[in-house]
């Protein structure tokens, strides 16, 4: 705590004091609602809605609504919100971030603001990090909402548009951040409003808000289709890159003369970049038989070479990615989980595939994209929950205008956080780590060992096997067992090695997890997985088989809870869960996420980090000075140093990296804000067309503007008729406005004419053609206008996205010309946007004036779509996305990947 906090009290303490009267008002109503019968309590929802309709605000009814929800939770779920959980609910309702420690019941806290805000009828989105949690919480907490008369929806991948539409129409919708974002993008690719699924962005509660809004902020959501580029060049570039010699440096100095460097490319370990040197460029020119790598004609080759050296010099197997079943799969740097379905952009993924000699996929074409930053900033009110947000408080304020309020724990925190032990070498560090693990195992204290990569977790596993210490390894390679391993990490004598924060979201309970043991017992009894899923689910059902399975599961759960209780006492007696960090992460928040796994709900626990000056963080950010100091002091490699100087140095290094990443995320946002403004313009215009606004007037205006623009382009000087290029103007409009004999005048006629006269003649011809088309197609023409306009908007918008990406890729060089790259990107980007708008006008008018009906086809509303290349879901297809898949049968595996049959999952 800083001096200011000691003198004036922390910001969180002051904010909690401010809302205390509201908390007391909620608690004071406990007896009132406890005395209500079920029917009266359930009727409160309708009463609250009537009060809102009569002019009351959500804040006015908050105490009563929270108290009613609190009582209902006790009756339906068997859980009553603690006072600190009521505090958390108020913070979330106010559109802020509530920092709550692990095990404090964030899932239950969200029910209070979700219920209150759902009463407005505008919808509430509860955002989770994965589909399992979304599905679980929608069923579990959904029982509470449904009991109180609200509807609950679930939006996850694999659902049909009709299922999604029903989910978003519900009062409260659960889903993942990815699915909410993708549904937004898909809604802005449809041709008919009936194909849209979302209905607005009123209020979102984001679980693990730091993971979604900070960690994933630099990863845009992209809907893509197959590109047309060949993959051969990736393999050729990789074969060339394999012949090059790299030079690894901690940090590259831009002032260094690269001509003197005797290496082919430089790997900057701090910035994680690879840069080809003049020597490397000369080798490339010789290898590919070109005159200059910097020639504009060789930009594509240069890009492939740059990605190939990045794949070989920067990206490391089993750290940044794994190769599994012939596929390159990204490893999440923050959680250690496999990111199935995600791919690096700009050809980097293909470069890694070429390096690893697996099938190189075609580079995808971006059809629609948005960052999480800009998606979540669309909500009228945004709130979040996490156990670790305070270190990122400034970023939440600057980017999202969210403040972080730290909530106290319901029970006093009994965890002991020991000082870091810093060793001179990694050998000394690992020796100490093995000793600590062995000591914990000997006294049967469970220990969770956190590592920063798959490679390091497997190295520690190998050393433990040599010592004969039984253990479990949890990393991206074994993610299928993640929840099971983490759930049992609190058993006496359990040794669990985990990369980063794998298993986050699964509580580690002292003594073991009774629910997992009960599930395991069901498996041993031969129960099918889908029935086990139903037995442990919370959804309403009348199926007798499922009801019997649930009753049996509850019996087993009761039995194992009784067996685990003395085991939990044993673990508490030896100090609770021991958390051992083997390396400091670049972010203090990730370190804190490891720490908070211990000491849940007042349990004892211990945390300690054992690090060395040879670790990447220390080596790249200030370790040399400390290494020299230790050498001068004659410190042995097996002697730990625990000093404030070292702790300050580590925190300083982390703060510098956090600042660097913050600047990178801000920079991403600066560029995306340019695209976002353009996206808002395009999507708002699209929405007006979808909403049924007549486009005929817009089409006529497009004709007039396009003709006027063309006339001014070809007839530059109003007075100098000799410079008029009437032939060029005629050729440009030939076949859809003009014909061969149009715009041919005698010299005398021409002298009397102005540009407005020419424009008037052309507009008259265009109007004539337009009216003829309306007569030809009859009532169907208005529908054709809509579809043609949307098709051209979508097609050219996709091209524009690609063009903007190319512009961004090269804009950084403007800095060398004393030009702000972001300003240059904004100015040139809007010039390109204007050109795209002109293209939309030309293509739309041209198509509408030349389109012809198919012979013997009655032009019905649905049939107008077919010649215009729209998909079954109503989206315009620029390029083929995928072959249409056959709908799964009821007994087929569900395409969402849950492992259940389709009839038991998304086919319900």
Language-model segments: residues:
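Compositionally biased, intrinsically disordered low-complexity regions used as flexible
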Residues: 1, 178, 274, 868-878, ...
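Conserved P-loop NTPase motor core
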Residues: 1-612, 617-631, 684, 705
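Generic detector of short, well-ordered, non-transmembrane alpha-helical segments enriched
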Residues: 3, 392, 445, 493-494, ...
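Extended, charged helical/alpha-beta scaffold domains that provide interaction surfaces
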Residues: 33, 321-329, 335-343, 572, ...
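Proline-rich low-complexity regions
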Residues: 113, 220, 408, 710, ...
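Short, Lys/Glu-rich amphipathic helical modules
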Residues: 444-457, 691-692, 746-751, 895
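Hydrophobic, well-ordered secondary-structure elements that form the walls
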Residues: 449, 497, 797, 833, ...
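Short Cys/His-rich zinc-binding micro-motifs
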Residues: 886-903, 907
């Amino acid at each position: 705590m800083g001096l200011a906090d000691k003198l004036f009290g922390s910001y969180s303490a002051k904010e909690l004091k401010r809302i205390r009267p509201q908390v007391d008002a909620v608690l004071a109503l406990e007896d009132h609602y406890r005395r209500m019968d079920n029917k009266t309590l359930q009727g409160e929802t309708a009463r609250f809605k009537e009060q809102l309709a009569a002019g009351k605000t959500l804040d006015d009814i908050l105490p009563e609504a929270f108290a009613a929800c609190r009582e209902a939770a006790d009756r339906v779920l068997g859980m009553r919100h603690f006072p600190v959980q009521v505090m958390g609910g108020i913070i979330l309702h106010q559109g802020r971030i509530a920092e709550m420690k692990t095990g404090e019941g964030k899932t239950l806290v969200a029910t209070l603001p979700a219920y209150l805000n759902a009463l407005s009828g505008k919808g509430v989105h509860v955002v989770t990090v994965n589909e399992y949690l979304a599905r679980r919480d929608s069923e579990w907490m959904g029982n509470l909402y449904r009991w109180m008369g609200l509807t609950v929806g679930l939006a996850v991948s694999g659902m049909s548009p009709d299922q999604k539409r029903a989910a978003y129409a519900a009062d409260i919708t659960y889903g993942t951040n990815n699915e909410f974002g993708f549904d937004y993008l898909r809604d802005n690719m449809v041709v008919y409003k009936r194909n849209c699924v979302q209905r607005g962005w009123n209020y979102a509660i984001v679980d693990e808000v730091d993971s979604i809004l900070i960690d994933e902020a630099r990863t845009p959501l992209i809907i893509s289709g197959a590109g047309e580029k060949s993959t051969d060049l990736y393999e050729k570039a990789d074969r060339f890159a394999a012949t090059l010699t790299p030079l690894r440096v901690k940090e590259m100095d831009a002032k260094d003369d690269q001509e003197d460097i005797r290496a082919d490319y430089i790997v900057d370990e701090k910035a994680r970049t690879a840069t080809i040197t003049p020597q490397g460029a000369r080798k490339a020119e010789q290898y590919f038989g070109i005159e200059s790598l910097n020639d504009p004609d060789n930009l594509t080759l240069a890009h492939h070479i740059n990605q190939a050296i990045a794949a070989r010099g920067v990206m490391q197997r089993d750290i940044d990615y794994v190769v599994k079943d012939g596929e390159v799969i990204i490893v999440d740097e923050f959680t250690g989980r496999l990111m199935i379905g995600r791919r690096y952009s700009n050809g980097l993924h293909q470069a890694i595939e070429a390096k690893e000699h697996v099938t190189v996929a075609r580079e995808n074409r971006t059809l629609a994209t948005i960052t999480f930053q800009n998606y979540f900033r669309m909500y009228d009110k945004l709130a979040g929950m996490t156990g670790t947000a305070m270190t990122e408080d400034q970023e939440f304020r600057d980017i999202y205008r969210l403040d972080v309020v730290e909530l106290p724990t319901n029970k006093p925190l009994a965890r002991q956080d020991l000082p870091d032990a810093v060793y001179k070498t990694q050998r000394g560090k690992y020796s100490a780590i093995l000793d600590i693990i062995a000591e914990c195992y000997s006294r049967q204290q469970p220990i969770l060992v956190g590592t920063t990569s798959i490679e390091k977790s497997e190295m520690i596993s190998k050393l433990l096997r040599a010592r004969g210490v039984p253990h479990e390894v949890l990393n991206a390679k074994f993610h299928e067992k993640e929840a099971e391993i983490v759930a049992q990490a609190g058993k006496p004598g359990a040794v669990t090695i985990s990369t980063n924060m794998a298993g986050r979201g699964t509580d580690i309970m002292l003594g073991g997890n009774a629910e997992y043991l009960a599930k395991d017992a069901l498996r041993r009894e031969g129960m099918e997985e889908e029935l086990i899923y139903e037995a442990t689910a919370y959804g309403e059902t009348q199926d007798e088989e499922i009801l019997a399975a649930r009753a049996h599961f509850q019996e087993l759960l009761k039995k194992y809870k009784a067996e685990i209780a003395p085991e939990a006492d044993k673990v508490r007696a030896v100090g609770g869960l021991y958390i051992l960090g083997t390396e400091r992460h670049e972010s203090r928040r990730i370190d804190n996420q490891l720490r908070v796994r211990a000491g849940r709900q007042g349990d004892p626990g211990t945390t300690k980090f054992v690090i060395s000056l040879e670790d990447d963080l220390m080596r790249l950010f200030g370790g040399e000075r400390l290494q020299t100091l230790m050498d001068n002091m004659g410190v042995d490699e097996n002697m730990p140093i625990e000093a404030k100087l070292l702790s300050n140095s580590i925190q300083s290094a982390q703060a510098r990296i956090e600042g660097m990443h913050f600047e990178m995320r801000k920079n991403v946002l600066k560029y995306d804000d340019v695209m976002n403004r353009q996206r808002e313009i395009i999507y708002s215009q699209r929405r007006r067309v979808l909403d049924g606004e007549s486009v005929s007037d817009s089409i006529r205006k497009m004709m007039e503007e396009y003709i006027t623009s063309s006339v001014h382009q070809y007839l530059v000087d109003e007075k100098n008729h000799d410079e008029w290029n009437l032939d060029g103007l005629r050729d440009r409009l030939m076949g859809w406005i003009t014909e061969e004999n149009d715009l041919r005048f005698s010299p005398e006629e021409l002298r009397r004419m102005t540009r407005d006269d020419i424009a008037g003649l052309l507009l008259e011809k265009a109007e004539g053609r337009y009216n003829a088309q309306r007569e030809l197609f009859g009532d169907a023409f208005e529908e054709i206008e809509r579809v043609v306009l949307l098709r051209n908007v979508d097609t050219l918008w996709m091209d524009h996205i690609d063009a903007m990406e190319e512009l961004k890729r090269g804009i950084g060089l403007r800095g060398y010309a004393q030009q702000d790259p972001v300003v240059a990107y904004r100015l040139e980007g809007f010039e390109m946007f204007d050109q795209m708008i002109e293209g939309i006008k030309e293509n739309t008018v041209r198509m509408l004036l030349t389109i012809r009906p198919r012979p013997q086809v009655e032009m019905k509303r649905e049939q107008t779509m077919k010649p215009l290349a729209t998909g079954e879901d109503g989206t315009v297809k620029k390029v083929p996305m995928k072959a249409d898949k056959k709908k799964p049968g009821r007994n087929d595996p569900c395409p969402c990947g849950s492992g259940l049959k389709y009839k038991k999952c998304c086919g319900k």
